[in-house]
Amino acid sequence: MFLAQPRGFCAGVVRAIEIVERALEKYGPPVYVRHEIVHNKYVVESLKAKGAIFVEELSEVPPKAVTVFSAHGVARSIEEEAAARDLPVLNATCPLVTKVHNQGKRYTSKGRTLILIGHAGHPEVEGTMGQVPGPVLLVQNLDDVAALTLPPETPVAYITQTTLSVDDTKDIIVALSKKFHDIEGPDTRDICYATQNRQSAVRQMSKLVDLILVVGANNSSNSNRLREIGTEAGIPSYLIADGSELDPAWLDGKKAVGITAGASAPEVLVDDVIEALRRIVPVTVSVLPGREENIEFVLPAELATA
């Protein structure tokens, strides 16, 4: 059995969870969180047990209650609603998501029409589209690019959802560059390091295994993409929440299993999957070499000394 490296929690997820935990310590429960803090049921249930209450709308938050915005970011209208209600807010938006917001604002301030490459309905996409003033055109695939009716001479710029890697977006960016004569976009070094690193690790691991298990939630965009990458490499790949979802039939005829985890999946769930495998077959675990991650994001000032 091989473990991909890196895997699991990224710095933005660690920061978001710590914000909720420190808020509970400093202010006491309940602390209200708009949307799942990260897309993982285990994490959400663990925080619920400590006193966090998860809501989808601010109208569900009582007056004066401490409120946390999830790692995915929110639209300006949500920020304005919270301010109008005088809710004490802790913003757990990933700093790399905030960076995308700021890039979009800079492009539109220069008079460019903004194109967002991302998944419709994803909370990060909804937040980004609501943060940038003016219209934002969402494209999910090459067909969406072909359907754009802007004149070719229109000054445009593009930004991308952070859970999409350079590899995920390169074909769309090429198509946009062919369609529009005046186009700007962020440096490829600006993409989310965690997305790129985890996808690259799965591609490398796929050369060594004949089965890939991705630990993560069904509603986790980056976890789903890791499974897709394994499948694209020709390796049977499955997304599972924990060891209870492991199907012994998947192991029939398999000699080497690879395990990775989405950016919002804690290592305890990886351990759970390994134990589930051990109950079926003898297991020797090897951690693959990979890019080391030492990035940390600062907490909001209100919690820095909590």
Swiss-Prot record:
One of its GO terms (biological process) is dimethylallyl diphosphate biosynthetic process. The keyword Oxidoreductase applies. Keywords: 4Fe-4S, Iron, Iron-sulfur, Isoprene biosynthesis, Metal-binding, Oxidoreductase. Pathway: Isoprenoid biosynthesis; dimethylallyl diphosphate biosynthesis; dimethylallyl diphosphate from (2E)-4-hydroxy-3-methylbutenyl diphosphate: step 1/1; Isoprenoid biosynthesis; isopentenyl diphosphate biosynthesis via DXP pathway; isopentenyl diphosphate from 1-deoxy-D-xylulose 5-phosphate: step 6/6. (2E)-4-hydroxy-3-methylbut-2-enyl diphosphate binds at H39, H72, H122, T162, S220, S221, N222, S264. Isopentenyl diphosphate binds at H39, H72, H122, S220, S221, N222, S264. The active site is at E124 (proton donor). It comes from the Bacteria. It catalyses: isopentenyl diphosphate + 2 oxidized [2Fe-2S]-[ferredoxin] + H2O = (2E)-4-hydroxy-3-methylbut-2-enyl diphosphate + 2 reduced [2Fe-2S]-[ferredoxin] + 2 H(+); dimethylallyl diphosphate + 2 oxidized [2Fe-2S]-[ferredoxin] + H2O = (2E)-4-hydroxy-3-methylbut-2-enyl diphosphate + 2 reduced [2Fe-2S]-[ferredoxin] + 2 H(+). Binds 1 [4Fe-4S] cluster per subunit. Pfam families: LYTB. Its EC number is 1.17.7.4. [4Fe-4S] cluster binds at C10, C94, C192. The keyword Transit peptide does not apply. Its cofactor is [4Fe-4S] cluster. One of its GO terms (molecular function) is 4-hydroxy-3-methylbut-2-enyl diphosphate reductase activity. Dimethylallyl diphosphate binds at H39, H72, H122, S220, S221, N222, S264. Catalyzes the conversion of 1-hydroxy-2-methyl-2-(E)-butenyl 4-diphosphate (HMBPP) into a mixture of isopentenyl diphosphate (IPP) and dimethylallyl diphosphate (DMAPP). Acts in the terminal step of the DOXP/MEP pathway for isoprenoid precursor biosynthesis. Belongs to the IspH family. This is 4-hydroxy-3-methylbut-2-enyl diphosphate reductase 1. It comes from Rhodopseudomonas palustris (strain ATCC BAA-98 / CGA009). The gene is ispH1.
